[in-house]
């Protein structure tokens, strides 16, 4: 029985010209690592949010300062993600889930808010070492 040698990726496509790792994205602030809180919410995979999700939904708007905090807003997001995973709305490598966030009224007035139902996307892909990890992003992000 003859074994054929498998062609490597470098042989097929040439050497990697540039790679931007998840670790670098977290260090640069492009991704926000929320793994510890995600584990508390029942999510087993390392988890990160895109900077856009963090700024748009986790960071507390100025008019809601003192009424909400980032930890509570993050918990709401991760709890709803965990519920979507348990309900099998996140299947395969991606899916969407909904979270309600208190957002400033228009025009902004201190302490006055309206609830906004937001649809976010969760993608499961490889971490730098090839193990699975989760990234939460806005639906328009990739």
Please tell me what each predicted stretch does.
Residues 57-141:
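Functional cores of ribonucleases/endoribonucleases
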């Amino acid at each position: 029985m003859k074994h054929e040698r498998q062609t490597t990726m470098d042989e097929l496509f040439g050497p990697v010209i540039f790679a931007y790792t998840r670790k670098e994205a977290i260090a640069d602030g492009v991704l926000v690592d929320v793994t510890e809180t995600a584990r508390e919410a029942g999510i087993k995979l390392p988890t990160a949010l895109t900077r856009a999700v963090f700024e748009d939904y986790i960071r507390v708007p100025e008019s809601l300062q003192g009424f909400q905090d980032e930890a509570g807003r993050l918990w709401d997001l991760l709890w709803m993600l965990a519920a979507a995973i348990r309900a099998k709305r996140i299947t395969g490598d991606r899916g969407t889930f909904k979270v309600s966030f208190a957002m400033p009224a228009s025009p902004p007035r201190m302490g006055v808010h309206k609830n906004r139902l937001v649809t976010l996307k969760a993608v499961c892909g490889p971490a730098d070492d090839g193990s699975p990890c989760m990234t939460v992003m806005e639906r328009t992000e990739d």
